[in-house]
Amino acid sequence: MKLTRNWLLVMSSFWMISNANAQFRKYSNEFLNIGAGAKGLAMGGAQTASAGDATAGYWNPAGLTEVKGNPVAAIMHAEYFAGIGKYDYAAMAMPIGDPTIATRTLGLSLIRFAVDDIPNTLFLVDPDGSVNYNNIRSFSSADYAFLLSYAQVIFGDESKTFSFGSNAKIIHRSVGSFAKAWGFGLDAGLQYRSKGFSFGLMAKDITTTFNVWNFNFSDREKEVLYLTKNEIPVQSTELTAPRLFIGAAYSSEISENLAIQGELNLDLTFDGKRNVLFRSNTLSMDPRLGVELGYKKLLYGRLGIFNFQQGLKDGDTTNLKKVWIFQPGLGVGFKLKQVDIDYAFTNLANQSNPLYTHVVSLRFNLKRKEN
């Protein structure tokens, strides 16, 4: 009952912040919303109810209690915007105590997103007004996140389980030598499983994750910023508003060799109206749908859609005609003994002018040594 009361208090904070959204940045720490693992990306990010491997630390930490027996790990690499942005992810989960029961599980996740070789044009123009391209230097922008996860079964038996999980996350962001930030936040999740059905709830940034930015400019850089009428920042705090994911999934065996799983997630934000399928001044809701077809638990095909948005129709010179667009996901998976190889083919733009990304990830079953 104490856990239930605490969870209700957490949920109430989502509605309280709707009256103070001026303090928050709508798109803060967006690198933490890219995803984890090619399986989840191929299914449109619909993983809140079904995640049950090392990637559950990202999608819903309550799902880590599904890791039984051996520790598991996952790694992923992806490149976005023709290789300009590089995204890396690694995670590990390990049962505590009796590994066959796994009522408690610990997880670790590392996330990095970076863009290198960004031109620094602060000194492009010499004092005499001439353009000197030799003055251009380059710098990198990198974002890091470290997630420590804990999950525990609240109650359960052979037919059903109800689990709770949480994340403590540390964030570090840097932009060349000019700006650096440290941040901290908490996530919490619930997951219920029973006879093919599963339900999940994931609350991200429940304590309004914060980043404290510090800026470091040389006297010469400050002079250029001043003369070009740019603001010279000293320190700032960036807040990320809470976000709620609700998911429901169902899995069934079609035949002796075929199985299917479908999941629907609702991504709820409380920081004002967003360009999503359902929106209001207080609440915005973006659906995510994913389907997986498995053959002999060895070969998998996956399909997903998410990120519904309304945009201007291509070729419309009046900028008045709007169409609904979405991001599709497509992927396959192979199981080879203790390793799962997953691939996803995703779209980062609208349907008529797509930016495609190929994502490959691996999941490992770290078999324990026998005595």
Language model: regions and residue ranges:
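Bacterial Sec-dependent N-terminal signal peptides
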Residues: 1-26, 291
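Subset of outer-membrane beta-barrel
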Residues: 23-371
